[in-house]
């Protein structure tokens, strides 16, 4: 991944990506993209079929870059299968994880409103299937089916809230608190077992929380020693004292 830093000159556009990965097209179902993504799954069957006709699909191997900072941004990318990490690189080469996309999530939404270039990197975290809809096609659908616009605005609102929360924590909270709040937010509501699975590696979690993997490991051990959590196999963590965790 470090070799990415010096590859700013390659400007991949909508058509470049689809041609580069042409061999993977046949294995990706357009229907699986359209029906799984929240901004489309409320549409009627005929409306979905209309969108599928202009959707292009491709596959990416683990570690492969979908787009780079500086690339032309001219389409919406929808994750059909797998995971994508969106991150930025500082001038010194330090990585900052922005978000992780799961099936049904999308990126490239700014291209819907204006011509622009990518401001971050998108990399496949596992073998990943992606569907793409060009800006021109999607703008037509936004006019034709206004409910899509409302769904996109809702997602914008969620991302803005998350971004503001993350920025505030970076400025005001110590690493212990950032980590504790992250673990608490991973909890699903309900009365079931208080167990979570970390949605990313410790390296990515460190990047997301603005620290180092070593610090994450040390802070998790501290939280365990203090009786707030119990680390299990893999990425599983049991929350033993949620109220106490929220006060860290």
Model features per residue range: what roles?
Residues 2-61, 107, 111-112:
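Cyclic nucleotide-binding regulatory module and flanking cytosolic helices
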Residues 38-39, 64-126:
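Cyclic nucleotide-binding regulatory domains
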Residues 48, 138-139, 245:
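A generic structural signal for short hydrophobic patches within well-formed alpha-helices
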Residues 49-50, 66-70, 190:
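Short loop/turn motifs at secondary-structure junctions and domain boundaries
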Residues 99-157, 161:
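Cyclic-nucleotide recognition modules
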Residues 125, 143-213:
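Polybasic "coupling" helices that flank or enter modular domains
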Residues 186-248:
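Phosphate-/nucleic-acid-contacting segments
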